[in-house]
């Protein structure tokens, strides 16, 4: 799933960069082409901003599943506590990664476009 998400983000970045270049460099584009390019740009930015939110909600289900697998083989109180602690730690780390991803993506799209040589 992460590999697919990374590929999606990379392809979104490529399409967004191409749309920006089209809109900035070629001012003689006809109206339909400009509108289509603008709509693609807006759609891609929306998808890339919303994509990390799906991972945030999947943290709970993934971590709960891992903890339940651990608990099925749980023998004794100490082992059960380790499983419970693992689930909490897993959720915390997963959410931190999701927040970090959202910030990176927002920063990428709020930067001023740079001129490529």
UniProtKB/Swiss-Prot annotation:
One of its GO terms (cellular component) is membrane. It is found in: Membrane. Residues 57-117 are extracellular. Its main location: membrane. Residues 1-36 are cytoplasmic. It is a single-pass membrane protein. Disulfide bonds join 59-94, 63-90, 70-83, 74-80. Expressed in endodermal ganglion neurons, apparently bipolar and following mesentery folds (observed in both planulae and primary polyps). It not expressed in nematocytes. The mature peptide may be cleaved at a dibasic residue site and be shorter than the sequence shown (possibly residues 1-94). Keywords: Disulfide bond, Membrane, Transmembrane, Transmembrane helix. It comes from the Eukaryota. The chain crosses the membrane at residues 37-56. The keyword Disulfide bond applies. This is Protein Aeq5-like2.
